[in-house]
UniProtKB/Swiss-Prot annotation:
Protein name stated in the entry: tRNA-dihydrouridine synthase B
Gene that encodes the chain: dusB
Cofactor(s) essential for the protein: FMN
Record-linked HAMAP family: DusB_subfam
EC number: 1.3.1.-
Purpose: Catalyzes the synthesis of 5,6-dihydrouridine (D), a modified base found in the D-loop of most tRNAs, via the reduction of the C5-C6 double bond in target uridines.
């Protein structure tokens, strides 16, 4: 699949997730087979651009793959400025967030709240597309409520404004992440527009990935929550799409290697004073299958030292084996 001048190496994209898809996680997903990774959502508010959190969220020139940054906001000029600053910092694709259902984002008329206001959507898309010379993409939901699904209208508007790829999560804003994603709306959009359409929502395994591609006709898939603690899902899905065969479960030794390497990268990226806190949630996700009684996770979450975290993981896997 192509986005503007960029040819993706496959049809699998790691979704932007606030507080999760930092540089270490993006790099790992790319190594595990994602064709594209997208940064955490960055606010278009210029007052926060110089914060440590914002600087860490920006892409880095030496990152692998096509550097893609997602921005969020409601003011067209601010969004355009945010796009320009990120391109100057190395972004090769700008993604606009109009899919986040979080209340703190929607209260500022950003994220999926914008779907209620097509005129504002048009203004934002036009300003951002005209502000940068890199491809601009858009992520939306199917609408703002089940009785108000307007993704076909927004999709056509996006194509007319110069958006070069569209990701659709198969729920409305009101649905949050409840219930099951629906793919009829994504299929309808794919039949309506000529730009690439990326399906998102509840793609949890290779069989589901194949089914969603076949049903929607989507050009690619975006995978988010299913990659938490399981970044190798991209490799599993790609293998199945290529061969029709399922890979065997990842050996425990490989899980250990990937987890420990990921934790070390988090320690290095955030520094020892913060990295151990960020690592906790990732370790919890990795070990959901292996530590169902939560005892180790509770013990691990009480550790406040980076080196002790790694020692605890080594001991855990030795005992588990």
């Amino acid at each position: 699949m192509r986005i503007g001048q960029y040819q993706l190496r496959n049809r699998l994209i790691a979704a932007p997730m606030a507080g999760i898809t930092d540089r270490p996680f993006r790099t790992l997903c790319y190594e595990m087979g994602a064709g594209l990774t997208v940064s955490e959502m960055m606010s278009s508010n210029p007052q926060v651009w110089e914060s440590d959190k914002s600087r860490l969220r920006m892409v880095h020139i030496d990152e692998p793959g096509i550097r893609t940054v997602q921005i969020a906001g409601s003011a067209p000029k601010e969004m355009a400025d945010a796009a320009r600053i990120n391109v100057e910092s190395g972004a090769q694709i700008i993604d606009i967030n109009m899919g986040c259902p979080a209340k703190k984002v929607n209260r500022k008329l950003a994220g999926s709240a914008l779907l209620q206001y097509p005129d504002v959507v048009k203004s934002i898309l036009t300003e951002v597309v005209n502000a940068v010379d890199v491809p601009v993409t858009l992520k939306i939901r199917t609408g703002w409520a089940p009785e108000h699904r307007n993704c076909e209208e927004i999709a056509q508007l996006a194509e007319d404004c110069g958006i070069q790829a569209l990701t659709i999560h198969g729920r409305t804003r009101a649905c949050l992440f409840n219930g099951e994603a629906e793919y009829d709306s994504i299929r309808a959009v794919k039949q309506k527009v000529s730009i690439p359409v990326i399906a998102n929502g509840d793609i949890t395994d290779p069989l589901k990935a194949r089914a969603v591609l076949d049903y929607t006709g989507a050009d690619a898939l975006m995978i988010g929550r299913a990659a938490q603690g399981r970044p190798w899902i991209f490799r599993e899905i790609q293998h199945y799409l290529d061969t029709g065969e399922l890979l065997p479960p990842l050996p425990l030794a490989e899980v250990k290697r990937l987890l420990c390497a990921h934790v070390r990268e988090l320690h290095d990226f955030y520094g020892p004073a913060k990295g151990y806190r960020i690592a906790r949630k990732h370790v919890s996700w990795y070990l959901q299958e292996h530590a169902p009684n939560d005892q180790f996770r509770r013990t691990f979450n009480a550790i406040e030292d980076a080196s002790e975290q790694l020692e605890a993981l080594e001991a855990y896997f030795e005992n588990f084996a």
